Curated annotation (Swiss-Prot):
CDD domains: CheB_Rec (cd16432), REC_CheB-like (cd17541). It holds the Pfam family CheB_methylest. The lineage of its organism: Bacteria, Pseudomonadati, Pseudomonadota, Gammaproteobacteria, Pseudomonadales. It catalyses: [protein]-L-glutamate 5-O-methyl ester + H2O = L-glutamyl-[protein] + methanol + H(+); L-glutaminyl-[protein] + H2O = L-glutamyl-[protein] + NH4(+). Phosphorylated by CheA. Phosphorylation of the N-terminal regulatory domain activates the methylesterase activity. This is Protein-glutamate methylesterase/protein-glutamine glutaminase 2. It comes from Pseudomonas syringae pv. tomato (strain ATCC BAA-871 / DC3000).
Amino acid sequence: MPGKKISVLLVDDSAVVRQVLVAILNETPDIHVMAAASDPIFAMGKLAHEWPDVIVLDVEMPRMDGITFLKKIMSERPTPVVICSSLTQKGAETSLQALSAGAVEIITKPTTGLKNFLIESAAELVAAIRAAANSNVKNLGKRTATPVLTPASKLTADAILPAASGHSMAQTTERIVAIGTSTGGTQALEAVLTALPRVCPGIVIVQHMPEKFTASFAERLNGLSQIEVREARNNDRILPGLALIAPGGKHMMVTRSGAYYHVQVIDGPLVNRHRPSVDVLFRSVARFAGKNATGIIMTGMGDDGARGLKEMLDAGSSTVAQDEASCVVFGMPKEAIKLNAAQRIMPLQEIHQAILHR
């Protein structure tokens, strides 16, 4: 017997977006668009009669903006919400507000060539809706998420950094922490970083997120945290009390120069369909930090970071996976656990302790 279809409500003031998305989604066997509304006021009329499994929501609309509508939804009946946002600075900042309010995913759309983009990105949108439908709703208001990037042939970290044959390095006492996360990661990272004291090991982070979003995200976390948080720049030194977030659209790797660790921010192909990729970061940490590092994999769909965490463990790093109960999507941690890559499985509220104490 076939399973129940995912019921979707579309809310977007663009008639083109509504028309194209309805056509795309209704052609997908496991998805059904229950209604399409031009703004949140119309959407609320639809919700009075039927409630969807997932809401796809624009953020900038007349009469009522998407953020106000989202907060209303999350306070009355928490529901997985996928944000459709333009790749502008204003759009990025507004979308981050949406993530804080409880949205699950960001899908970015251009300001021109919209129809062709939506058709070409159909697989991305479908993946985001499926992830949202399978998300842990009870965690939505507490810790939320990020974008699914454009699908491509699935390259591994070998495309950026070939696997090393050994891990012998000069001695150093500096300790670093590498964190990888995706769907659910924006507020999961907020929960972890805001729990840290000013004095803590240097941290490098890959959060799956488009370009233009990461700078705003880092700035927001910096304002909430005792430690310094910023978007990484090429050749930045990893310092105690500093968290560096990989820029969207770039890979980030850790390197060593004498006793000091630095980051390289580079271009390159999508790895595990992502750029930045957690596997790329974790492999570089395994090679250049080894036993001086801790690797942490948190909420997110897919398997990016699972193999890299195993490489870190094999290189002598301590490793942690977030537990299922506190994840929005138990994908990346689950795959790492399957590979026996995680020494410890911890709830979100305890993960900061793994940063402070190896």
